[in-house]
Amino acid sequence: MSYDLLSERYDELVRFDYDGLFAAIKPSFVPSGAALDLCSGTGTFALKLSEAGFKVTCVDNSPKMLTEAAKKARAARRQLLFLQADVNSLKIYGKYSLITSTCDGFNYVKSEENLKKLFGKIHDALTENGVLAFDVSTLYKAENVLSGQTFFEDTPTYTLFWTARKIEDGKIGTDVSVFKKEGDGYKREDGFFVQYFYRNETYKRLLEQQGFDVKFSDGETYGDLNEKSNRLLVVARKK
């Protein structure tokens, strides 16, 4: 499943701290030139990059997510470029001083080999001293918070059930059912997606192999990372 099913409700459901994340990574870059936002979703973070002074390209695998992002850009009178692509088979054209991915985008990279290739492509696409910044849910969160849990959201226009289950180590499958209000009844839509979780040391090793200097922090507090951190924030600078 792509995120098409959730596109119209994504911002309401996720409630992600984009402001906090932007403030956390802002000291690592100079806001000029081109930025590439991978797995950009509805474009909230991309708009922040645009407002900061970047010329921004948004990449996402969901056409409906990109449609929502384009609506936001028009409303904000911002010119962004939108491209549909899967991060697992991504081709990057051009050069960027900043490449980002927020809110678990890289949790959809399906293998360590794909992750290694992606980091290599990003390194090649960055300008000298360019920065890659991304955040992911940790393996600790997958095993201790997500696995076996059911989440529920009820609003006047829709009801959503979200059940996560462990498929194997480092791999969580999520069943999603959305009941959308239509007249006197509801229309049901179902979906399923898989997320992939890697050890923090794996990200560090693969990034360093591709030529990055790497800094980790907690992706929720933006302080020091610890073994029970639910989110990992990575700022990696091209050597």
Each predicted region: which residue ranges?
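SAM-dependent methyltransferase
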Residues: 113, 133-204
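A short glycine-rich, Lys/Arg-flanked "PGG" loop and its adjoining helix->strand segment in the class I
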Residues: 116-128
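A short acidic, Gly/Pro-enriched loop at the edge of an enzyme's catalytic core
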Residues: 91-98
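Residues lining the SAM
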Residues: 102-104
